[in-house]
Amino acid sequence: MSTPDNVSSVCEHWVVPAYNIQLWLGRQHPCCVIIPVINEGERIKNMLNKMHALNISGAADIIIVDGWTTDGSLGVSALQQLSVRGLLLKTSAGKLSAQLRCAYAFALEQGYEGIVTIDG
């Protein structure tokens, strides 16, 4: 398993697309669930409601990486009520793989030991 120092030295050589941190409440668990989204509308709200009902946030931190959603489905206060701990906004070119590279680099920099990815 990589230590944070090892991760930092490896990350220096990665080409990570630019992103902004819209919401970050800190790491609570050793694992996280990463959800890449773009204009998911009610679908992401329904999925987050189901995850909240199942208390997924009791076992892993939920981090959403947004590829420039314009449908208003990712209000920060609503996400916080559904136990989302992080919202990243990809600001450079690229599609899904760029979103995932942003999120994985962020998760490793935060010291997560396990990452689960689900489709938004």
Q: What do the PLM-derived regions correspond to, one by one?
A:
Residues 66-75:
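A conserved acidic beta->alpha catalytic loop
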Residues 67-68, 91-93, 120:
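Short, ordered loop/turn segments at secondary-structure junctions
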Residues 112-120:
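Short beta-strand-to-loop acidic/aromatic patch adjacent to the donor-nucleotide binding site
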Residues 42-46, 71, 98:
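Residue-level preference for short helical/loop micro-motifs built around acidic side chains
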Residues 74-110:
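Conserved donor nucleotide-binding strand/loop of the catalytic core
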